[in-house]
Amino acid sequence: MTRLLDASLVLLPMLSTLVGAAPATVSARADTCATKGKPSGKVLQGYWENWDGAKNGVHPPFGWTPIQNPAIPQHGYNVINAAFPVILPDGTVKWEDGMDRDVKVATPAEMCEAKAAGATILMSIGGATAAVDLSQTAVADKFISTIVPILKKYNFDGIDIDIESGLTGSGNINQLSTSQSNLIRIIDGVLAQMPSNFGLTMAPETAYVTGGSVVYGSIWGSYLPIIKKYADNGRLWWLNMQYYNGDMYGCSGDSYKAGTVEGFIAQTDCLNKGLVVQGTTIRVPYDKQAPGLPAQQGAGGGYMSPSLVGQALDHYGGKLKGLMTWSINWDGSKGWTFGDNVKGRL
């Protein structure tokens, strides 16, 4: 042991000389970078999976991929939703390698690298399996206090609200339920502690939005007061309503099958015109809409072929803010046909 230590002491000056002789070949990646703010142009927004969807057999051969993979911007994606943090029953948010099976998160430096290459990166909250208990204020407060340090450390540019359970309406759109109040508490609590250009998007399923044209209460239309608040006060960057995994609705309670151009247009026009529920109008103009579609067959019910996606987009002639898709990894597993089709049409 003593000999090894002596030898290392002799080698240290030599190593220092070698390292100092070629500084141009050694560079440390920055692990902090500024919040980017809302993209001024069109967006193609995709979910980045922090787990391995090839290893678990969902969408081989393209599983986990680095968030800074140059293929992502090459195929048109300029907004990335990093999915999903683990949320413990008490509201504690976790974002770290191994927080769930086969999960690996991007480092702060890798986040900065992706952002330098053009990406705006949001943390997506919720999803089908990462629920937040919205019935308790203490849980909401714990959520805020634990997510804000993560958002700052990892250089996120915003949050995406993708909560798919636990949010219900009171039956009176002018009276918030406990779960609606606590979701607003979470959003306000996060935004208050982040830079003023920190972003907010939402990706509700159709029942939570245009489903309110059928009836308001329970899950039906339960996102509407939240959407209205942040659309009206200017903090909502845009809405990514999921045009899949269920029927779609127009302003008059009319119903359309997912995966149809007719349904795409009916929902989009309804929000642009303004959905009136119990005398309250909720309006999301075209330039604050980036509807969500499955990237590939199997990614979600209501898949639209590239031809149908093109028809839906071309109908609006560039009026929409963009499109969202589930997911980047799914698209990569089938030759990036979604991104390649959309990027030239926005």
What are the residue ranges of the model-derived segments?
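Residues that scaffold, gate, or flank divalent-cation-dependent active/transport sites
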Residues: S327
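Fungal secretory targeting signals
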Residues: M1-S27
